[in-house]
Design a protein with these regions (language model features):
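Surface-exposed short loop/turn segments
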Residues: 44, 48-107, 118-127
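Stable alpha-helical elements in mature extracytoplasmic
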Residues: 30, 34, 38, 42, ...
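Generic short beta-strand segments
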Residues: 2-7, 67-72, 115
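Short, Lys/Arg-enriched charge-dense amphipathic segments
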Residues: 14, 71-88, 133-139, 149-153
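C-terminal/domain-edge helix-coil "capping" segments
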Residues: 48-50, 93-95, 104-163
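Flexible, glycine- and charge-enriched loops at secondary-structure boundaries
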Residues: 28, 32, 87, 129, ...
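A structural "domain/chain start" motif
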Residues: 1-35, 125, 149-163
Length: 163
């Protein structure tokens, strides 16, 4: 599963000037949501590409160690009494640190880092848990497609040519 870490001072910055305060438990829920979306998006993309998701080490098994860092949710949907609507120009941003290891030898095979920021189109939009999740899914989908493409390239370069 993807681990997650918020951008430095994220909670303090979110709570500055807001009557609705982000609690540690809210942060844990957001991290769990991010991990769930990551698992869902990457599993879908890789299985559609013909890759099997393994729970155990073995021959031809890669260990994938993902970490979402510098997570900056612009407008977290925090439970509150009454009806509260939060607006923001963007869902926020996050960085993926991804490492691939040989599952048997634990040798690092590849490492990648990429930062994604949600689009800014100058319009304020109502931000909800659903819209934040959809935007996270869209951002992570690009990463999943890039991983699948890299794995496809590696597989093609190591597959013996047919005679």
């Amino acid at each position: 599963d993807a681990t997650g870490a918020f951008k430095k001072n994220w909670k303090r910055n979110q709570n500055r000037g807001n009557t609705l305060k982000v609690r540690d438990s809210d942060m844990v829920k957001i991290q769990e949501e991010v991990a769930d979306v990551f698992r869902e998006v990457f599993t879908k993309e890789l299985t559609e590409g013909g890759y099997e998701i393994a729970d155990e080490e073995g021959e031809d098994v890669l260990l994938v160690k993902p970490a979402i860092v510098d997570l900056d949710v612009a407008a977290p949907d925090i439970p509150s009494p009454g009806r509260t609507m939060t607006y923001a120009e963007s869902a926020g941003e996050m960085t993926l640190n991804l490492e691939l290891y040989d599952s048997l030898t634990n040798d690092k095979i590849a490492k990648a880092t990429d930062r994604k920021r949600d689009r800014l189109d100058g319009r304020m939009e109502w931000r909800t848990k659903v819209s934040n999740r959809a935007d996270a899914r869209r951002m992570m989908s690009g990463w999943a497609k890039a991983l699948r493409s890299a794995l496809d390239e590696a597989r093609a370069s190591t597959t013996p040519a047919a005679d």
